[in-house]
Every structure is written in structure tokens, then in C-alpha cells.
């Protein structure tokens, strides 16, 4: 699969948040593009590019938009706002579900776009693990994506943000993890 270096929807989604992202802007943009490309590679087709672009742009954005490490609900809210304004015909429920489940421990199964949601979950894990978890992606493709979108300190930002959260919330150290459970309902 060819690496996509720019996508108009992903750019339009991120642009208004440049100031909130601050010094992490390049790191987060690159992360969003790596996850977008890895998810495309896992799906094996480009039929869902717009959905993946929106999901990639917003999946972790709540860290910066709402200044919290409990960021899934804020990220979903920002995605919904964007969709209402810019892409009202996009599959909002699927995008919100993909954001909700992207840190799920275990495979996403069932109906309702489970294949896309699980591909997105695995793509994010490939990136967050720095390729230790490969999800079956070709090594050459991963290297090509990383050459276009280097880490730029993204993992350090996550580590610092996560540790700061943990100090203030020791009983909820990783609030964004989701346990595998029931299958998704068909839509």
C-alpha cells in the first residue's frame, strides 16, 4: 500500500487545533498520519479513507483540547463537532466507536464496523509500541511511513502526560484502557 503523505480531511480536522497542540503539533500530526496509513495498510483498501482520516485526527486530541489524560470522551466530542460542521454525512457513530475502542485490550468483534475499528486499534498499537507490535504490517511499509512521519518526540509527550496524570490520579493510572468484552452491536 502506498503511503499517503497528506489528506485534506485530516489536515482540515487538525488545523484549528494547532494552537492547543503547541509544541506537540508536529508530533501529534505525525502520529495521526502514521496511524492513518497503518490502518489503511491493515484494511488493505482505501474505501474508508475519510473515516480513517477523521478518526486519526481526533482519537487522542482530547489530551490537548481538554488538557486531560482521560481523553476519550473529549476526543469523541471534538470529532462530533467537526463532523456536524464539515462532514454531516460521514459515519459519526463509527468514528466515535473507533475512538472509544482504540485502546481496547483485545480484538474488536461483531457488527457495526468492527473490522475498521479493530484495524484502527491495531494501527494505533503498532505506532505506540514503536513497531514492537507489528499487526502483520510489512516492515518495509512501516519504515516508509516512519520516514515520512518521524516520531518527533510523540512517545515522550505521552510518557510525560501519562506520568503527570498518574501522580494526580494514582487509582486511575490509565483511564483510557478498555477491557475486551461483548461484541459490538450491528448497525
Predicted regions mapped to residue ranges:
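Divalent metal-dependent phosphate-bond-processing catalytic cores, especially two-metal-ion Mg2+/Mn2+ enzymes
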Residues: 1-8, 13, 20-46, 87, ...
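Short amphipathic alpha-helical segments, especially helix-boundary/capping motifs
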Residues: 8-16, 52-57
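Short coil/turn segments at secondary-structure junctions
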Residues: 18-23, 59-62
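Short gly/ser-rich anion-binding loops that grip negatively charged ligand groups
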Residues: 25, 65, 69, 85
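An active-site-proximal "capping" alpha-helix that borders the catalytic cofactor pocket
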Residues: 35-39, 70-86
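His-Asp-centered metal-binding catalytic motifs of divalent-metal-dependent phosphohydrolases/nucleases
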Residues: 50-66, 71, 75, 96-103
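Hydrophobic alpha-helical segments of small multi-pass membrane proteins
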Residues: 79, 100-101, 124-125
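Membrane-interface starts of transmembrane alpha-helices
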Residues: 88-93
Amino acid at each position: 500500500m502506498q503511503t499517503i503523505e497528506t489528506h485534506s480531511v485530516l489536515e482540515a480536522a487538525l488545523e484549528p487545533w494547532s494552537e492547543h497542540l503547541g509544541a506537540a503539533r508536529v508530533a501529534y500530526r505525525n502520529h495521526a498520519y502514521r496511524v492513518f496509513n497503518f490502518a489503511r495498510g491493515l484494511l488493505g483498501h482505501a474505501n474508508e479513507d475519510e473515516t480513517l482520516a477523521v478518526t486519526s485526527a481526533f482519537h487522542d486530541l482530547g489530551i490537548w483540547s481538554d488538557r486531560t489524560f482521560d481523553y476519550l470522551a473529549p476526543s469523541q466530542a471534538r470529532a462530533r463537532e467537526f463532523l456536524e460542521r464539515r462532514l454531516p454525512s460521514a459515519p459519526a457513530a463509527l468514528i466515535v466507536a473507533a475512538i472509544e475502542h482504540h485502546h481496547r485490550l483485545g480484538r474488536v468483534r461483531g457488527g457495526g464496523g468492527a473490522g475498521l475499528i479493530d484495524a484502527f486499534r491495531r494501527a494505533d498499537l503498532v505506532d505506540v509500541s514503536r513497531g514492537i507490535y507489528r499487526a502483520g504490517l510489512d516492515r518495509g511499509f512501516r519504515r516508509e511511513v516512519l520516514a515520512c512521519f518521524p516520531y518527533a518526540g510523540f512517545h515522550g509527550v505521552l510518557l510525560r502526560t501519562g506520568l503527570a496524570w498518574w501522580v494526580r490520579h494514582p487509582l486511575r493510572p490509565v483511564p483510557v484502557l478498555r477491557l475486551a468484552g461483548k461484541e459490538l452491536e450491528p448497525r
